[in-house]
Amino acid sequence: MDQGQTLSRLLDSYGTDARTRAVAAAVGAIAEASIEISDLIGQGALAGITGAAHGASNADGDVQKDLDVRAEAAIVAALKNVPYAALASEESDTLLMGDPQAPISIAYDPLDGSSNIDTNMTVGTIFSVIPNEPGVAPFTAPGSCQLAAGFVVYGPQTSLVLTLGDGVDIFTLDRAAKTYRLIRERVQVPADTAEYAINASNHRHWEQPVRDFVDECLAGTDGPRAKNFNMRWIGSLVAEAYRILTRGGVFLYPADSRPGYGEGRLRVLYETHPMAFVMEQAGGAASTGRERVLDVVASTTHQRSPLIMGSSDKVHRIVELHLDPAAASRTAPLFGRRGLFRT
């Protein structure tokens, strides 16, 4: 693709059959809705946008913010002419059913991280497009079946990260032209970055494998990884993912012992599946700690899952620690500064 090529031009040339045309239509519609959402976020209180609760609760039990509701409305309106069988939204208790013969279904989180609005932090939109098989219940396939996935980051610039199953491209919103333009193509997760992201305040609730990995990072040059690490925690899934695509590293949102966190906190259909698809398409990896995220099959619309994503070597190390409890003690003396291979 040419640098600066518009997203609409890419989508116009994508696919020749009904399913791929529907994928292009869905991505284009979500992109159009995201421009409206970006404008609303940019105006903030001037447009009546705040992080104040709207009063109702969404399907996840979170109190909806005003912008959650408006973002949901924008996406539903944008998708009205897209041939879909079902929509699964973070903001809806039930599926929104369309044409059962349509070639695709779509899952999305219209505004991920809306609690960040009042503090002027990054928020985003996440989406996943999957094939629909008439006669088969929607959203019952593993994440590896996704046709397209991506997310929009509403930050200093509004950027759209997209995979159509053949690599990852990043587009940035040209506000004057109200269109997305390509800025990076065939993005690859940097392999060797000394950064990890986790909410360290929950240390006492983590499983031992997570503690072991973080302890390895904290040990720095004296530890088994033989390098100093920086910890990042933005509290915004889309921002964490964008940073990893740009700088590498690993993000952990594990299951833990707190009530309601035993299966993780992020939702499979519209958070962990699309993020995992993007990461793998960019040469990274994504796991629950014990299972590849793209092998997970959701049994309910809002099923939760742990998510560990980023540079493959770090994700694989965390998986090793989960699957082999002896891995932590076996590795530490071999590679530490004062271990077998260092003096």
Swiss-Prot record:
Molecular function (Gene Ontology), one example: magnesium ion binding
UniProt: Mg(2+) 2 binding residues: 109, 112, 271
Positions with a binding annotation for substrate: 112-115, 199
Catalysed reactions, semicolon-separated: beta-D-fructose 1,6-bisphosphate + H2O = beta-D-fructose 6-phosphate + phosphate
Protein name (Swiss-Prot/TrEMBL): Fructose-1,6-bisphosphatase class 1
Cofactor: Mg(2+)
Broad class of where this protein is predominantly found: cytoplasm
Localisation per UniProt entry: Cytoplasm
Enzyme class, spelled out: hydrolase
GO terms for cellular component: cytosol
Keyword flag Hydrolase: yes
Keywords: Calvin cycle, Carbohydrate metabolism, Cytoplasm, Hydrolase, Magnesium, Metal-binding
Binding site for Mg(2+) 1: 90, 109, 111
Oligomeric form and interacting partners: Homotetramer.
One Pfam family recorded for the sequence: FBPase_C
E.C. numbers: 3.1.3.11
Record text on cofactor binding: Binds 2 magnesium ions per subunit.
Biological process (GO), any one: fructose 6-phosphate metabolic process
Family indicated by similarity: Belongs to the FBPase class 1 family.
Biological pathway: Carbohydrate biosynthesis; Calvin cycle
